[in-house]
């Protein structure tokens, strides 16, 4: 999950449930009345649209983070037979990624065919130019604009306002304008869903019901008070019949978290446990995840919000401990729009049962915090993966023409948490048993290969298949705190007496600070006219950027004697577009084994520039892009030597006989 759970806050879900129901019923009736006319019109026009097409259908199977080095190694060892067959029948190439090498950036380039300065996504996090605080880069959720105040109560009138910060136009919307249908499943940076001629389920950066990017709850009989510093740590109180506690949900009208009480007891048989919540009893087996459990957070007559969680008993002695996933938005009754059309999420839930809707559904932070172990993390990742497979194969069946695009996240999340098993000397392995997990990555690659094989079996000769990843992977052993380096070199100034190791730039004297770092991508200049407390004048900006780049190029880690930063680039040298100034001014090309430190990401200033990364998150890709390309397999031969992820959008347009629009910078790669 994003460090510190950067999110829009809670309290955004109440008050709109009844309104949404009425709107949904009305919309459904209108659609039903219009359907025959639309069907005939689209059939006639759609037939015309496909006459110029070179293929009937394009399928994008996205395996986030699949690494070319490991793919090539396992293929050489004959361990990935389906990818080997796909390579032989069509082709394989390393796929040039983006800078920064982050999923939000890369998949936005995939969707739009444009560079970050045109689509406005430079990473997971941006920053407020008013407060310097980190912000979610992809979307913002605001409370309803109209509120009824009754004393201390604030009753929202209507649904929350959700703004998409990604700019430019994705290829599926352009295809839809020509009546070419697309089904888009869990492609990052699709929240909130945009209206187009097709179906879409949102992905990365879709919040949980509390408004965060994924805040778990952990219950223990050892806790005496609620602690919200990293996830939610909540006491589990003993009763005459077992234990009891509460689920803390979104904020209610009075500002406090709405609660759902629950009880936990050992079953009379002694073989399992029973969790009772919302008048339903759910069977729990220690060490095994529950099914999705529905929760209803009520504020009386003011409305309610529904969520779903999975629960895992992690210990029964000496303490009873319970892990609960972040509260996912219930797909059967979404509190926020998570699909287009809105009833598509409901349709999938009716078809296959409840499923994870959180953008970052695999709880990496719970493993970092050691509230779950490695096996529990793997179990969760593959449960989510199984849900995605059901959606994907349903889409293949229901979309015989047009585009099907689905991104699977397990490959990325598992490598983040288990890449360290390839390196016995990784700092995160100290004092931990890792030998049992040395085969996890190979097993994951074999599972992804099996998915590719089952996909190929379902395709006909008129379907163009791409299997791709947005980036590769490398080790993350050492963190680099750029804010500390800036401080030590006089570019970032602390107030007199300010303490170190604080997040969100606490203690920074902006009246004397010329540069700062936030997020994973790079550095910002504290500019006059852009930042609220900027001090660097327009005529001084370019010289300062080049000065910083020259000093940071080749930065050496004194403890290891290794080069930590290969090259620093001016973003203005790499990208052109209307949103250039929204991104970092300098992009940092880290070497293998290095990355921005955890503290630096959220605006912290540490005592030392370099530090060991001791978290389970021991693999990463936010480094120099030449070190972490993605992969591109196809059942047709790729005709260019250096394909980039931005090439796929214009290639899609071209394959359907359409001229790519001017904003797309890539080129067609298959005739």
Where in the sequence are the language-model features?
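Active-site-proximal N-terminal segment of extracellular/periplasmic enzymes that hydrolyze or transfer
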Residues: 41-92, 101, 177, 664
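His/Asp/Glu-rich, glycine-adjacent segments
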Residues: 114-431, 514-563, 597
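Short, strongly hydrophobic alpha-helical membrane anchors
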Residues: 1-10
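Histidine-centered active-site microenvironments of extracellular/periplasmic hydrolases
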Residues: 469-520, 575-629
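A short beta-strand-to-alpha-helix junction
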Residues: 163-166, 446, 494-519, 534-546, ...
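Short, structured active-site-proximal loop/turn typified by the sulfatase FGly-forming signature C/S-X-P-X-R
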Residues: 72-121, 125, 183, 493-494
């Amino acid at each position: 999950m994003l460090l510190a759970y950067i999110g829009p806050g809670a309290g955004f879900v109440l008050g709109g449930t009844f309104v949404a129901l009425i709107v949904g019923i009305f919309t459904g009736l209108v659609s039903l009345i219009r359907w025959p006319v639309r069907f005939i019109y689209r059939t006639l026009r759609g037939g015309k649209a496909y006459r110029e097409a070179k293929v009937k259908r394009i399928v994008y199977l996205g395996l986030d983070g699949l690494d070319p080095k490991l793919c090539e190694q396992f293929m050489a060892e004959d361990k990935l037979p389906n990818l080997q067959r796909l390579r032989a029948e069509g082709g394989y190439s390393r796929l040039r990624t983006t800078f920064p090498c982050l999923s939000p950036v890369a998949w936005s380039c995939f969707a739009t065919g444009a560079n970050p300065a045109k689509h406005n996504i430079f990473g997971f996090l941006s920053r407020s130019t008013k407060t310097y605080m980190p912000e979610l880069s992809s979307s913002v959720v605001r409370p309803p604009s109209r509120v009824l105040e009754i004393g201390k109560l604030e009753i929202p009138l209507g649904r929350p306002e959700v703004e998409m910060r990604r700019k430019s136009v994705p290829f599926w919307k352009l295809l839809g304008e020509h009546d070419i249908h697309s089904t888009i499943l869990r492609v990052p940076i699709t929240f909130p869903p945009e209206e187009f001629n097709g179906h879409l389920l949102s992905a990365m950066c879709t919040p949980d019901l509390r408004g965060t990017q994924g805040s778990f709850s952990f219950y223990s009989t050892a806790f005496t008070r609620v602690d919200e510093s990293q996830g939610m740590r909540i006491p589990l109180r003993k009763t005459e019949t077992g234990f009891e506690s509460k689920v803390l949900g979104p904020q209610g009208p009075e500002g406090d978290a709405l609660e759902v009480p629950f009880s936990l007891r050992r079953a009379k048989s002694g073989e399992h446990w029973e969790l009772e919540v919302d008048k339903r009893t759910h069977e729990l087996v220690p060490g095994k995840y529950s099914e999705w459990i529905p929760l209803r957070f009520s504020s009386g007559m003011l409305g309610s919000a529904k969520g779903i969680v999975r629960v895992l008993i992690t210990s029964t002695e000496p303490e009873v401990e319970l892990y609960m996933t972040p509260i996912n938005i219930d797909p059967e009754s979404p509190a926020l729009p998570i699909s287009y059309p809105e009833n598509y999420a409901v349709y999938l839930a009716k078809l296959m049962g409840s499923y994870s809707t959180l953008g970052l559904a695999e709880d990496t932070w719970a493993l970092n915090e050691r509230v779950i172990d490695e096996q529990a993390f793997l179990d969760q990742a593959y449960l989510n993966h199984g849900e995605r497979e059901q959606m994907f194969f349903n889409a293949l069946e229901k979309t015989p023409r047009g585009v099907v695009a689905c991104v699977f996240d397990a490959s990325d999340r598992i490598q983040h948490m288990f890449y360290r098993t390839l390196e016995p000397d990784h700092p995160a392995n100290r004092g931990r048993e890792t030998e049992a997990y040395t085969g996890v990555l190979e097993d994951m690659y074999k599972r992804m290969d099996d998915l590719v094989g089952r996909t190929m079996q379902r395709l006909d000769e008129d379907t163009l298949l791409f299997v791709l990843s947005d980036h590769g992977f490398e080790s993350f052993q050492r963190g680099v705190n750029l804010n500390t380096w800036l401080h030590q070199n006089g570019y970032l100034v602390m107030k007199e007496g300010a303490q170190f190791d604080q997040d969100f730039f606490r203690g920074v004297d902006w009246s004397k600070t010329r540069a700062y770092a936030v997020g994973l991508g790079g550095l910002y200049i504290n500019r006059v006219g852009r930042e609220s407390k900027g001090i660097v004048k327009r005529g001084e900006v370019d010289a300062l950027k080049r000065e910083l780049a020259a000093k940071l190029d080749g930065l050496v880690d004194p403890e290891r004697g290794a080069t930590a930063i290969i090259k620093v680039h001016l973003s203005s040298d790499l990208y052109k577009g209307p949103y250039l100034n929204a991104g970092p001014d300098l992009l940092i090309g880290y070497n293998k084994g290095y990355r921005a430190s955890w503290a630096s990401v959220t605006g912290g200033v540490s005592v030392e520039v370099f530090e060991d990364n001791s978290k389970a998150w021991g693999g990463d890709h936010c480094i120099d892009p030449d070190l972490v390309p993605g992969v591109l397999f196809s059942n047709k031969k790729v005709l260019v030597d250096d394909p980039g992820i931005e090439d796929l959008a214009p290639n899609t347009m071209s394959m359907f006989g359409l001229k790519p629009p001017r904003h797309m910078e890539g080129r067609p790669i298959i005739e």
